[in-house]
Each structure stands twice: as C-alpha cells, then as structure tokens.
Amino acid sequence: MLLRFTKMHGLGNDFMVIDLVTQHAHIQPKHAKQWGDRHTGIGFDQLLIVEPPSRPDVDFRYRIFNADGSEVEQCGNGARCFARFVLDKRLTVKKRIRVETRSGVIELDVRPDGQVCVDMGPPRLEPREIPFQAENAALDYQVEVDGCEVELAALSMGNPHAVLRVENVESAPVHELGPKLEHHPRFPQRVNVGFLQVVDRQHARLRVWERGAGETQACGTGACAAAVAAIRQGWMDSPVLVDLPGGRLSIAWAGPDQSVMMTGPAVRVYEGQVRL
C-alpha cells in the first residue's frame, strides 16, 4: 500500500510526518530505519506519527521514531511540526492542542505569526526519573569518560539529557564525546548530549548530539534542557534565546515545578507517498 507523508523541519531538524488518523497502517521500527536512510530512503532525523487519542482529555497521540528505528519519548522540534501538520491537514481547528506522548501530555499553541509555543511540562531532576545512576539529585555530576572526569548536568524533558558547558561550541568535542556519553552506562536508556556556550545572561549557543540520530541542526528538548541547566546554575535568566546550527529558539522557565515553554518555527517542505 501507499502511505501519504509530509516532509517538515524545525530549524533544520527534519521529519517525515505520517497521518494515521485518516490512513491505517502498522508502522514498525524497521520502516523508520528504512525510510530514515538519507541515501536509499526519504531521509530524516525523526519519523513522527499522528494517531487518534487513546484517552478523552487529549486531541491526538504523538509517536516518535529515530532514524535508527528506536522509539523515543519526546521531540520538541517535532512537537512544533506536529501542531502545524494537524492544522494544515485540517485534522483539527483548535489553535491550542493537547497531545499524548510516551512521557505524558504536552500542549501546543499555534500563534498568528506561525510560531508554535510548546508547553513541555516541568523538567524532571530526580536521577531515577531521567534515568541516571546517581544517589541524589544535584546541580551537576562528575562522569568518568576514558579515565577523565566530565562535569555535566543531567535532567529529563520527557527524554534524558546531559548538558556540558563549553567555552566555544565551534570547537566543542561533539562527535568525540557525544557518542561516548550517549552510551555511558550511567544513562541506562542512553542520553542526548548538549554542548552549551553561555554568551550572556539571556543568550546561549548550543550543539546537540541526539541519541539514535547523531548531531542534528536543532534539538528542541535539548534547548529546553540547556536553558533549565543554565538557569539552575545561576548562569542565565529566563527567557533564554538559544542559537542552534539551524536557528533560534526562545525558552522560558520560571523555576522548580513550573513548565518549560519553547517557542519556534515549523516548516512544511514537501508532500509525498511511500510504499509500506
């Protein structure tokens, strides 16, 4: 059978989006891996699946697969594209949408200027909720990599993140240290790794090594995690402008137990069909 799909991106973080509300198919990890190949498939960082809700208090269910076929809990840039997609496809007329993910419910607000604001919920800081192997929650942790101690913050934005402060993101060891931390045994579900440069109290630069995808042009949950880590450390004040290789996100966080608010663009690239 042929499935309709839409190619989208949020700051260069690119997605294949499939509507399983009006189409019916059983998509498996092998399909994500096949379609995600940039040489022989469609090519993407993540595959986003739009499904009917499984509970009455939400509008849709949102599933995410990395290009390596692994299913993950959350994707911030994908959430913005999800909101734009369901409106463009007239799957809803609501401008504020409640969406069920593997890690909980998020709220998406499509603004008149086309920007999408995502209520990502509060960050999770307890090690068992990240998950991260540590006895107690702390502002930062020491993790041993190749015999050296690496200082990082660890938290969850619905998916696990490590955040390292660097002097300059251009020279940060993203491709050397990123995969080593991604697969570090203290992160039992692997981890996304952010390399954060603080420019001033409300402006940062960030590169992210995403688990299952490698370095991407942008990572929404990574920007949220970096902003939360920087605010908790006292390095920055909310709201924070985060510049990623693909563009800029605005992140606001009022403090403990408060939701992280992420605002940025979502762009449709093209429509297509793929054989299942």
From Swiss-Prot:
What keyword terms does UniProt attach to this protein?
A: Amino-acid biosynthesis, Cytoplasm, Isomerase, Lysine biosynthesis
Q: Which gene produces this protein?
A: dapF
Q: What is this protein called?
A: Diaminopimelate epimerase
Q: In which pathway does it act?
A: Amino-acid biosynthesis; L-lysine biosynthesis via DAP pathway; DL-2,6-diaminopimelate from LL-2,6-diaminopimelate: step 1/1
**What does the protein in this record do?**
Catalyzes the stereoinversion of LL-2,6-diaminopimelate (L,L-DAP) to meso-diaminopimelate (meso-DAP), a precursor of L-lysine and an essential component of the bacterial peptidoglycan.
Q: What is its EC number?
A: 5.1.1.7
Provide the reaction this enzyme catalyses.
(2S,6S)-2,6-diaminopimelate = meso-2,6-diaminopimelate
The places in or outside the cell where this protein is found are: Cytoplasm
Chief localization class?
cytoplasm
UniProt-listed GO biological process terms: lysine biosynthetic process via diaminopimelate
